[in-house]
Structure formats: C-alpha cells, structure tokens
C-alpha cells in the first residue's frame, strides 16, 4: 500500500446516524455506492434538543426508499483540517435516484418550510454537495455492535496515489487489508471503514475509519 497510496489524517469526528436502512449484504467488497456530502455550519440555536427535533421532522419529510443511510459528522478535536464544519453524509441507492429525490425535495413546500425553520440550528450547502463512489468493505458489526445511542467515532484520512496508483489499485488492496484486520485483535471496537472516491478527482480518495469510541479508535489504529 505504501508504494501506491499515502494517507494523512485530516479530521476526527463524533458521528451520529440519522437514518439507516438494513445493511447491504453484497459480498463484493469492491462494489461502490453513490454517496454525497454536504458542508454545514452550526447556527446560534443549535443544541441537542433542537438537533433532535430537526432530524425527527426531516425524517417525516422523506419519501420513498432511495436514501439508504444518513450520518452527521461533528468535529471532535480543534485540530480538524475542516475546522468547525459539520458534514452531512447521504448514501443513496443510485445517483439517478438521488437526483430524482433532490428534485422532489426542491419542489416540496414542507421541505422549504423545514429549512427555514431550522436555518438557525444547522445551515447546510445542499447546492454544492460533493459526490462520491464509496466502497464499504467491512460490515459495521464485524467487531461488535455500535452504541444504541447512534453516536460513534470517526477518523478521516486523505489518501493520495503515488507511482501511478489508481482507484483500481486502492480497491485491489481491500481484500488483503480485511485479512489483516481480521487477525488484528479488533474485537469490541466496532471497527469498520469506508473508501470514498470523489467523482472527478483522480489524485486520491478519503479513507474513513469508524469505531464505537475514541479509545477503540486508538486501539484499532495503533
């Protein structure tokens, strides 16, 4: 891996799951899924109570089953490269389905009212959301279930290709990495990971590590 990919830690986050449908059981660990990220800023009225209310009302507005999962990433340390940006991740059944869902959202008067109501809680840049093809090579419960609260810990690394490395090389690395992790004593950490390949970026990709706590992350990445 070091010959073709160099990874640098860019951010640590406390993560919360807002919506998650049953996990995909496809056994092809190199298969990718369409994912979007929106950059968000906390408003003056943000609190646990207002965020809970905001997410609850948002879930009531969702239509169909094209949204597979949604996660929010809040900075856990002051040294994050993204500073105070909160990231909202959306995983879809396909890019076409995502586009259809967004078009319906933009025409939904109740959705517009929801955005206006909660703009002082969380302001997200949906217009400039970023598109990724994402591989999830390991089940989220491979090394223990995540907390019932829905919160877990994430570290995001930016990986650059070296010596002519490509996305295909990165995907080809996954099977060997899984084998190493399975022998690494990760039990009880809830460790799993994802590789996020931004559309139009041929220089590298994001590697996300996920665990049930900061202590588990330290154990898994030691």
Per-region residue spans from a language model:
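Short S/T/G/P-rich N-terminal loop/turn motif that feeds into the first structured element of a domain
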Residues: 17-87, 91-222
């Amino acid at each position: 891996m070091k010959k073709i990919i160099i990874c640098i830690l860019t951010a640590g986050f406390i993560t919360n799951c807002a919506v998650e449908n049953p996990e995909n059981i496809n056994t092809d660990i190199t298969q990718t899924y369409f994912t979007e990220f929106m950059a968000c800023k906390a408003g003056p009225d943000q609190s646990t109570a207002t965020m809970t209310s905001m997410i609850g009302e948002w879930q009531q507005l969702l239509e169909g089953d094209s949204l597979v999962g949604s996660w929010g990433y809040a900075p856990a340390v002051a040294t994050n490269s993204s500073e105070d940006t909160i990231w909202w991740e959306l995983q879809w059944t396909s890019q076409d389905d995502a586009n259809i869902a967004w078009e319906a959202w933009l025409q939904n008067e109740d959705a517009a009212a929801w955005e206006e109501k909660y703009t002082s809680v969380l302001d997200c840049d949906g217009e400039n959301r970023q598109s990724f093809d994402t591989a999830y090579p390991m089940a989220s419960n491979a090394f223990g279930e995540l907390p019932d609260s829905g919160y877990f810990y994430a570290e995001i690394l930016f990986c650059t290709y070296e010596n002519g490395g490509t996305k295909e090389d990165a995907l080809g690395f996954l099977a060997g990495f899984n084998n190493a992790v399975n022998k690494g004593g990760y039990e009880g950490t809830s460790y799993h990971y994802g590789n996020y390949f931004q559309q139009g970026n041929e220089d590298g990709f994001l590697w996300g590590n996920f665990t049930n706590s900061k202590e588990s992350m330290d154990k898994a990445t030691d």
